[in-house]
Curated annotation (Swiss-Prot):
This is Nickel-responsive regulator. The gene is nikR. Belongs to the transcriptional regulatory CopG/NikR family. Pfam families: NikR_C, RHH_1. Gene3D superfamilies: ACT-like. Chain A, domain 2, Met repressor-like. Homotetramer. One of its GO terms (molecular function) is DNA-binding transcription factor activity.
Length: 132
């Protein structure tokens, strides 16, 4: 591990200290390491450098919408090679929450997630991508 020195303006340091307290970091170093990891991960995603990933796709949908449940199930089966696991939750009489764990090439995971989120009556779709 290397020790470095940085200069941060007072307002930014105050905001960082608030975040450290709220999130319960033991020290500033660990908080800055996490921020650096997150920034590097985001940059590699934007630049297309991340070859393989694990993705967490979460979305809600109206299960009573005509054939939607069947379409979503077929989509998962059609991509069985990247769909590792799914959790299904009944939110109320009409709405369900699906959380899917995906593992593959980053482009394939994004394509799958985009396809699911584009279905009519699928709402609040979010994909979190983690590097492998």
């Amino acid at each position: 591990m290397q020790r470095i020195t940085i200069t941060i303006d007072d307002d930014l340091m105050a905001a960082l200290d608030r975040m450290i307290e709220i999130k319960g970091y033991q020290n500033r170093s660990e908080a800055l390491r996490d921020l650096a990891r997150t920034g590097l991960q985001q940059a590699s995603l934007e630049e297309g450098q991340m070859e393989a990933c694990v993705g967490v796709l979460s979305y809600t949908y109206d299960h009573s919408a005509r054939d939607l449940s069947k379409k979503l199930t077929n989509t998962h089966h059609d991509h069985h090679n990247i769909s590792v696991a799914s959790m299904h939750v009944h939110l109320d009489h009409d709405r369900c929450l699906e959380v899917s764990i995906l593992k593959s090439k980053t482009d394939d995971v994004r394509h799958f997630a985009d396809h699911v989120k584009a279905e009519r009556h699928v709402t609040h779709g979010t994909l979190a991508v983690l590097p492998l």
